[in-house]
């Protein structure tokens, strides 16, 4: 049976690659888009276009019906209030609409997400809200893979060997933290859906010189899994303590975490690769 993926942010620079990767892998690939004409021009043939606003609950509920996975490649652009409404709000809306606990969630955020005292974050709160979106995903009970890519497109042409890191230790906030090709980000987000070892993991993604690996199973297998029901990745520094979070954020985190699916056997019980 053909499985269905919904991509949120499909017309962005990563989303376009994600759609191509998903179609090539044989998934029925849906994209939630605001502008049908623009999306039809940009997205590959075979993509099913669902027109609507990703912050609108009825629209999202219709879009996620019968999906097997959701892939988030969306992102804000630094405007006032955008980080909360887009980076966090869209994830919250989609998770709230999902009824099937087995739906896999692939979420793209950013390397350096645990650095909250930078000038950029103080101005936009982007990293605060991206990290809060990660927390929602972890507490939701859904099988998930959270990918924190390095600097998009700063890689050299021969820099295709993927490197998975954990603990968010590259925190300079410059390209020296690591670079990655856009299509490789999409590859990890899409391929993770069918790799049981990828479930319940958080990783930073960069590349180094050398050819890309033929498959990602061994890379995912080497990662530490997040603790069940946790809010932060297993090796993350506690730089955004829950004790200092706004009440509304804590209430939403508590609400989404009331029913947390166990994932001690994530490798076989939930990943698509188990079927």
Label for each model-derived stretch:
Residues 2-3, 103:
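Nucleotide donor/acceptor-binding cores
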Residues 3-27:
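N-terminal Rossmann NAD(P)H-binding glycine-rich loop of SDR-like oxidoreductase domains
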Residues 4, 11, 176-177, 182-275:
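Mid/C-terminal beta-alpha module of Rossmann-like enzyme folds, strongest
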Residues 6, 10, 31-93, 97:
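NAD(P)H-binding glycine-rich loop region in Rossmannoid oxidoreductase-like domains
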Residues 9, 33, 109, 206-207:
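Short beta-strand/turn micro-motifs composed of small residues
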Residues 14, 70, 137, 147, ...:
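Non-catalytic, hydrophobic alpha-helical segments
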Residues 56, 90, 133, 181-184:
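Conserved cofactor-binding/catalytic machinery of classical short-chain dehydrogenase/reductase
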Residues 76-168:
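Glycine-/Pro-rich loop/turn segments that contact NAD(P) or position catalytic residues
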